[in-house]
């Protein structure tokens, strides 16, 4: 139920914004990011699909959880370099998902690493719904 409220809040935030979606490339928050990707997907985000996607290896060696943790509420460790990875869940890292440019770069790089392709808008929305619902 809390995730549904998060999704609805996110949609209201973007739909009532006086700025077009392209103007949201400034600093943002998790709710706005979810609304942007849900709108681009053209369908409601599903946090359960997002969790399954986040934890799956997709036929390769890594999953999102390989570096970000399972769940991604604490500090992770990059599977290849051993570098520290900040918590990804906005509830435990208020700076997470607060820059559209960084979110776009994060999805582009990590989807390519895990899937060997760009994530779809629906996959991004689902993952954001999952992350936003974590406490």
Protein language model regions, located:
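Substrate-binding/catalytic groove segments of enzymes
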Residues: 61-62, 74-78, 114-118
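Short alpha-helix boundary/capping elements
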Residues: 58, 72, 132-135
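Post-cleavage N-terminal segment of exported redox proteins
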Residues: 1-47, 91-135
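Gly/Gly-Pro-rich "capping" loops immediately C-terminal to redox-active cysteine motifs
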Residues: 65-103
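Sequence/structural segment immediately N-terminal to covalent heme-attachment motifs in c-type
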Residues: 42-69
